[in-house]
């Protein structure tokens, strides 16, 4: 059958979520995925025999609880195991641990700076307030401020009212928070370079901004925007890797009668009488539906899988100008055992959370400077996590499930050049190696 | 100048308004207040009025002012204060802006057209100008308005919001969307969307970033800075008025004194005198460096907000939250000033005559690289700069046949990591002259004397915090009703009787007179 109520293009986690909701609402939906696996960036893959990686995304916190509940994802097998803490490796033997446990966190902060330990309460309270407004908007459709349609006007008024309700002082603080740099905001609270760097590291990954860039302050919301099972600000790894999120969504979709096709890349969106009516697959098959939903980025959607002539005037040009600039790379490493890190009392913390490698905001900014100018950084900002035995997928052997992944500022211009790829890998590894006594690692 | 400034206060004199600082905004405010009949005293710490626009003899016979050209001085202010009658010519011929090229053709932007670029770029420039002028016109009325306090239910305040909303709406749907899209874009993205020529892109982005801690890649406020600078009729083109920027200062002083204001130089203010009683605080006078006190009904500060509140008022009179908001103002300067006395007109490669505003920045990356060094507290290896040779336009600035070269040099950090020393200053000065010499090979032999003012020097000489041109960075959170902070954004302050009237207030820096004008209007309200 090639006739549906809705076609969703791309089985990334948003495509899966969208399809599952539509299916749950009773629509006859088909979700089309180009790859032979689902999940997009949220996937678990066996890239090395016997090792299951979360090969792209690597940690979960921002996934909305409402989706978890609406689609009953727990019943479909999703279990997120929270980090107990993270460790930031500074220069030399400097280490900063952040724990989810408040008392432990306070003691550790005090070790670096009693002032910062006090400031943390203020910092958390302020961020939580800023996050509240954003949380209210996350599950709403942003209005078109140029439109006079009642829905847009109503939504615009909703935003205006939310803002107005904050009161004068808060409005100014909000404007400030959302337009200044992460470094400037952190300087208001903390004095320790290591603490500041650790705080910024939560969000700067993946942005095309440096910690000194105006507007980068919002990345700090990563500390408070998300949650694991209602525990605000917590981060966690799904049991089974990031692919478990996609698997649970796919299971929910199928339970509601939705269809999922892999190896089904969309070649073009069909438009008739200025309305999308279906798609043509790469294999030539035609599928028709009254609703076509694209989970590809806006640029791909409008410039790759649509005929320019089918678009209203100006859309192609705007999509073409839309800025998408990757700034992170990732390395997955299979290790024969748990590496021993220098400067850690034991491996308790890194078994239970993430690792970041950065000594100061300046170091992070310098990595960004290199990216800006199309160069590799000698000292890239690196972030990683271990797959700890407790959350290994049940089908893997218990002894060897550990892994590091690293994201780092690096130029996106040279992506795909094999030799260069090795060069960045080794730059990243060398920055980690100074902290690791590696035991028989293989890449 | 000095004959009008030497009236001595008898100690018992009482003024309606005392203005601290005779920078151009202080003078504009003084002229408006005096014109309305107030008894006004302007106190200036240095020996001439003008602040960063004042002319100085930096080498015997050679004169220069830190601000070397004007681009969007308010025409309303010029006509209100009848500056033409006091020697200021508003309709001075604008300078071409010349982007210097090391090996191919220079790019010249003059009177709305381009030369030295491909015809594609020239066409794109027409589209770019049309759109930017449209947006600049839309925003223009607001630079001369007092920004309302958010939450105010005052009708006039609400009208200002409604007016802005209406102006944006009136542009039509497409323009409105485009405005929202580009308003916070980094200058670099905007330039890349329109143009191919690297020198053109660097030259046009220059006005978006100069003066603040920003480079072409910095998002948020560069486009707004460009639009701010395009607000007046000259559309952002620079001009050197008769007598240089100092000529404007002199006409403002003359207009103010003609209306009865007194300008006292060599009269630095140490403290604002605050009276406190059960009803609260009240600013009632000032104490000069020599101990003299002068009383007035209101004190108006034309110095920067940080200096005003932290040094002149004192934190003991301020609420802690307010003090913190003033302390966290970002006002570290990143522009240095180079003055060079030359024994002849410098010859730039393939440039007929150095009579324009010359930008040395081969591409936007060059600006970005210079910024990258400075933001880490280092000296740029290859500084970028804007040059004017004011003596071409006004022969009185240098001895006959000789010339003054004036350059804004970016980016030179106020906070140099190793701390500022004479050798650090010499080093960056040498690098700047090296850059100059790449484009004007014979210039080293022409140099009679040079003076390099780092932001720290500017802070010391001109008493402006951070050596910052604009008293505070032109950034989203330090603009409009948030400039300098929300309790002091309507030209009044939390201390009754104390007002602000300079670049630290809306609409901000550059030589516009707008802040002085707006403050006077609020005070007379």
What are these regions (language model features)?
Chain B
Residues 13, 240-242, 261, 268-399:
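Mid-domain catalytic core of redox enzymes
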Residues 197, 201-216, 380-388, 442-506:
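A glycine-rich dinucleotide-binding beta-alpha-beta segment and adjacent secondary-structure elements
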Residues 343-461:
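C-terminal segments that line or cap access tunnels to active or ligand-binding sites in enzymes
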């Amino acid at each position: 059958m090639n006739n549906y109520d809705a076609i969703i293009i791309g089985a990334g986690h948003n495509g899966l979520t969208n399809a599952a909701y539509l299916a749950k609402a009773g629509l006859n939906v088909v979700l089309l995925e180009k790859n032979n696996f689902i999940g997009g960036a949220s996937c678990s893959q066996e890239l090395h025999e016997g090792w299951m990686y979360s090969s792209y995304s690597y940690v979960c916190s921002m996934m909305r609880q409402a989706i978890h509940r609406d689609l009953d994802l727990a019943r479909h097998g999703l279990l997120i195991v929270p980090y107990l803490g993270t460790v930031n490796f500074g220069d030399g033997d400097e280490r900063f641990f952040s724990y989810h446990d408040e008392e432990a966190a306070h003691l550790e902060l005090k070790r670096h700076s009693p002032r910062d330990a006090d400031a943390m309460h203020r910092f958390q309270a302020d961020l939580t307030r800023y996050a509240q407004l954003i949380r209210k908007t996350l599950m709403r459709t942003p209005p078109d401020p140029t439109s006079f349609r009642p829905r847009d006007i109503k939504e615009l008024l909703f935003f205006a009212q939310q803002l107005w309700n904050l009161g004068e002082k808060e409005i100014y603080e909000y404007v400030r928070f959302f337009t200044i740099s992460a470094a400037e905001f952190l300087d208001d609270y903390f004095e320790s370079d290591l603490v500041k760097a650790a705080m910024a590291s939560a969000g700067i990954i993946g942005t095309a901004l440096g910690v000194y860039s105006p507007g980068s302050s919002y990345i700090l919301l990563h500390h408070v925007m998300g949650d694991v099972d209602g525990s605000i600000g917590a981060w966690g790894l799904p049991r089974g890797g990031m692919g478990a999120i996609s698997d649970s969504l796919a299971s929910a979709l199928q339970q509601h009668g939705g269809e999922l096709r892999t190896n089904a890349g969309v070649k073009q969106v069909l438009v008739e009488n200025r309305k999308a009516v279906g798609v043509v697959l790469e294999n030539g098959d035609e599928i028709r539906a009254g609703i076509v939903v694209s989970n590809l980025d806006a640029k791909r959607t409008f410039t790759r899988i649509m005929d320019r002539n089918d678009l209203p005037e100006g859309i192609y040009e705007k999509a073409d100008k839309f800025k998408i600039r990757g700034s992170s790379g990732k390395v997955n490493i299979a290790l024969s055992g748990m590496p021993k890190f220098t400067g850690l009392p034991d491996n308790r913390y890194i078994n239970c959370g993430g690792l970041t490698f950065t000594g100061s905001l300046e170091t992070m900014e310098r990595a960004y400077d290199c990216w800006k100018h199309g160069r590799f950084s000698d000292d890239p900002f690196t972030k990683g996590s271990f797959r700890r035995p407790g959350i290994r997928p049940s089908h893997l052997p218990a002894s060897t499930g550990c892994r590091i992944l690293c994201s780092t500022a690096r130029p996106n211009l040279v992506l795909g050049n094999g030799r260069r790829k090795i060069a960045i890998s080794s730059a990243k590894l060398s920055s980690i190696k100074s902290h690791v006594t590696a035991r028989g690692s293989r890449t | 100048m000095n004959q009008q400034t030497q009236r001595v206060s008898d100690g018992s004199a009482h003024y309606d308004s005392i203005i601290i600082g005779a920078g151009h905004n202080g003078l504009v405010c003084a002229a408006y207040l005096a014109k309305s009949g107030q008894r006004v005293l302007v106190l200036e710490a240095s020996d001439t009025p003008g602040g960063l626009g004042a002319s100085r003899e930096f080498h015997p016979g050679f004169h220069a002012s830190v601000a070397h050209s004007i681009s969007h001085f308010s025409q309303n202010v010029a006509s209100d204060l009848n500056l033409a009658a006091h020697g200021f010519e508003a309709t001075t011929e604008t300078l071409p802006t010349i982007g210097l090229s090391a090996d191919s053709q220079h790019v010249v932007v003059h009177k709305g057209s381009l030369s030295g670029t491909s015809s594609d770029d020239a066409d794109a420039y027409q589209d770019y100008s049309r759109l930017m002028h449209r947006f600049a016109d839309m925003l223009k009325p607001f630079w001369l308005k007092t920004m309302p306090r958010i939450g105010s239910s005052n009708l006039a305040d609400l009208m200002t919001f409604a007016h802005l909303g209406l102006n944006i709406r009136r542009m039509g749907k497409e323009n409105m969307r485009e405005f929202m899209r580009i308003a916070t874009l980094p200058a670099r993205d905007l330039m890349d969307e329109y143009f191919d020529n690297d020198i053109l892109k660097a030259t046009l982005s220059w006005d978006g970033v100069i003066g603040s801690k920003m480079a072409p890649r910095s998002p948020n406020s560069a486009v707004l800075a460009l639009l701010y600078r395009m607000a007046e009729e000259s559309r952002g083109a620079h001009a050197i008025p008769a007598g240089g920027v100092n000529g404007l200062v002199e006409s403002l002083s003359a207009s103010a004194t003609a209306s009865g204001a007194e300008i006292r130089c060599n009269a630095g203010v140490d403290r604002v005198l605050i009276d406190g009683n059960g009803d609260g605080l009240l600013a009632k006078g000032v104490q000069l460096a020599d101990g003299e006190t002068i009383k007035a009904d209101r004190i108006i500060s034309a110095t920067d907000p940080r200096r005003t509140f932290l040094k002149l008022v004192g934190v003991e009179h301020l609420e802690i939250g307010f003090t913190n908001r003033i302390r966290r103002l970002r006002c570290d300067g990143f522009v240095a000033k180079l003055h060079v006395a030359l024994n002849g007109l410098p010859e730039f490669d393939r440039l007929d005559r150095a009579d324009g505003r010359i930008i040395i920045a081969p591409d936007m990356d060059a600006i970005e690289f210079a910024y990258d060094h400075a933001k880490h507290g280092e000296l740029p290896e290859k500084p970028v700069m804007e040059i004017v040779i004011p003596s071409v336009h006004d022969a009185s600035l240098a001895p006959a046949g000789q010339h003054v070269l004036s350059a804004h040099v970016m980016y030179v950090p106020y906070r140099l990591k190793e701390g500022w020393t004479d050798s650090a200053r010499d080093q960056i000065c040498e690098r700047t002259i090296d850059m100059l010499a790449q484009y004007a090979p014979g210039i080293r032999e022409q140099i009679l004397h040079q003076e390099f003012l780092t932001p720290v020097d500017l802070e010391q000489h001109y008493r402006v915090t951070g050596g910052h041109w604009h008293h505070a960075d032109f950034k989203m959170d330090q603009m409009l009703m948030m400039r300098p902070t929300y309790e002091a954004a309507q030209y009044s302050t939390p201390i009754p009787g104390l007002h602000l009237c300079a670049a630290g207030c809306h609409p901000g820096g550059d030589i516009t007179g707008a802040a002085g004008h707006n403050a006077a209007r609020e005070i007379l309200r």
